[in-house]
Amino acid sequence: MTDKIADTIVKTIDYAYTLIGTPYVLWKYNEEYDFYCDIIPSTQEINDNGVNCASFVNLLIQYAGRKIPENTFENSLRGGTDFWFKYFNSKDMLTKFDYTIKYPLGTLFLRNYRNIVDQGHIAMLLEYYEKDSSKILYSKIIHAYCYKDIRQVGITTLGHSHFSISENTGYYEYAILPIKWLKI
């Protein structure tokens, strides 16, 4: 990873920390929802309106100086999880998620949208496990999520997020390396 990319990722992660505690809002089918594709609103406005997992990552992508691409995909909402799957797939940026790989910080983890109940998910690798950075499932991710009574932008371990819903097979399907998504 070049110094410029590493610097961009550090700054983006620093910005992500400022959004911890932002309320999570679930996207509801057929409702207008601003996935924050065109601007980064004030922190107050973001807190007032909340984010879902995709709109949170859209903010991070924009903070990294990238523009959210226009939607050219049928039956996708610009900036949503299905949009990102189709976009990254069309640009050959997806790699199969493998929890034995030590991914670089800033890697995005994606589960594709399936339906209104399983809307997919997207999160960013934030910190390595301090005792052994090769144990990626112990590493921390930042994402907008709901789990039990928690509905916010927060930090969890990748392993907890990966196995809390799909215990046998795991939740995340793809990884998008920073060197790839920074080409947006």
Task: Give the ranges of each region predicted by the language model.
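Low-complexity, Gly/Ser/Thr/Pro-rich intrinsically disordered linker/tail segments
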Residues: 156-184
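Intrinsically disordered, low-complexity, compositionally biased regions/tails
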Residues: 25, 84, 124-127, 158, ...
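Charged, glycine/proline-rich intrinsically disordered loops and linkers
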Residues: 38-41, 87-93, 166
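N-terminal capping segments
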Residues: 1-72, 182-184
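Extended, compositionally biased low-complexity polar/Lys-Gly-rich tracts
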Residues: 50-61, 106, 139-147, 176-181
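...with weaker cross-activation on analogous glycine-rich loops/strands in unrelated enzymes
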Residues: 10, 66-152
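Low-complexity, intrinsically disordered short peptide segments enriched in small/polar/basic residues
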Residues: 2, 6, 10, 138-139, ...
